């Protein structure tokens, strides 16, 4: 049974608004979601008390319309959106993003350093992942047939942010290592690399990620714009060794558990109601 203020989760891509809304619903929050971010639905906004946007640049229109309609507004910074605000070259766009943030009753960050980038006080809250699903995958009898899984979606900017040059150098230096490069559904990996030990997978559906992890021994994530990549903790739960920006990661934040995430969200929301 759901109760309390009704929440509309707004977001496109990853982290997925549907997963966040489901975590909230399971914890008793009356939550729905939309990934149709370009044209805010006034009707949907009127039906709810809170508009909760994921990734500033995709949810800003919803935030502004919701504020005009007197709703409580929340933005959750994912990582690259905070870097985007920091490096925005246009003065009028910088003013626009500041205006959107000033319209927010509450701001979440997946990592403390993003708060420093944005310059607006908020609450650190990692997104939930399907922890039970990945723990179950760890218990499977599947034997890895590849060595390294590496995330690097295609695109000139993505190649720099996710350091395509790093993994190609690694592949050349470790010819016996079987390496997989993967992107995501919004930005697939479509590289043509003349490296016999590298396989390119454009992307896989979210439901197939546990199987993909189990095919590999190690996940390596290298990025110039670090947030709190959920792949890092999904892979740990699946039993992989995880290297993130040169350091091994072994711990999973408690808020990755859907129930813990929802409890933290409810506490933060209660403080501003």
Language-model region placement:
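Active-site proximal beta-strand in glycosyltransferases
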Residues: 50, 66-85
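Short His-centered aromatic/hydrophobic patch
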Residues: 53-59, 77
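Membrane-proximal helix-turn-helix segments that form the acceptor-binding/catalytic region
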Residues: 80, 89-106
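A short, active-site helix/loop in glycosyltransferases that binds the activated sugar's phosphate group
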Residues: 101-124, 186-189
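Acidic anion/phosphate-binding donor-loop and adjacent secondary structure
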Residues: 129-145, 190-192
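Conserved donor-binding/catalytic core segment of Leloir-type glycosyltransferases
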Residues: 140-162, 168-174, 179-182
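Nucleotide-activated donor-binding/catalytic signature segment of Leloir-type glycosyltransferases, i.e.
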Residues: 188-207
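Aromatic "clamp/platform" in nucleotide-sugar-dependent glycosyltransferases that forms part
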Residues: 224
């Amino acid at each position: 049974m759901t109760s309390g203020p009704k929440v509309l989760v707004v977001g496109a891509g990853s982290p997925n608004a549907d997963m966040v809304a489901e975590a909230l619903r399971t914890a008793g929050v009356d939550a729905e979601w939309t990934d149709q971010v370009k044209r805010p639905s006034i009707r949907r906004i009127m039906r709810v008390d809170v508009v909760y946007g994921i990734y500033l640049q995709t949810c800003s229109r919803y935030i502004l319309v919701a504020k005009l309609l007197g709703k409580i507004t929340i933005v959750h910074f994912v990582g690259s959106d905070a870097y985007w605000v920091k490096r925005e070259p246009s003065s009028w766009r910088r003013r626009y993003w500041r205006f959107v943030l000033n319209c927010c009753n509450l701001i979440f960050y997946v990592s403390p350093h993003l708060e420093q980038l944005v310059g607006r006080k908020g609450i650190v809250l990692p997104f939930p992942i399907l922890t039970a699903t990945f723990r179950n995958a760890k218990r499977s009898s599947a034997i890895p047939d590849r060595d390294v899984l590496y995330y690097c979606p295609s695109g000139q900017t993505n190649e720099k942010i996710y350091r395509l040059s790093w993994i190609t150098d690694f592949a050349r230096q470790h010819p016996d290592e079987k390496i997989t490069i993967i992107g995501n559904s919004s930005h697939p990996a479509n590289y043509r690399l003349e490296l016999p030990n590298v396989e390119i997978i454009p992307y896989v559906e979210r439901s197939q990620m546990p199987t993909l992890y189990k095919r590999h021994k190690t996940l390596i994530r290298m990025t110039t714009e670090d947030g709190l990549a959920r792949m890092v903790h999904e892979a740990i739960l699946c039993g992989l060794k995880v290297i993130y920006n040169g350091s091994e990661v072994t711990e999973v934040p408690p808020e990755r558990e859907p129930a813990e995430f929802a409890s933290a969200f409810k506490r933060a929301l209660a403080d501003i109601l």
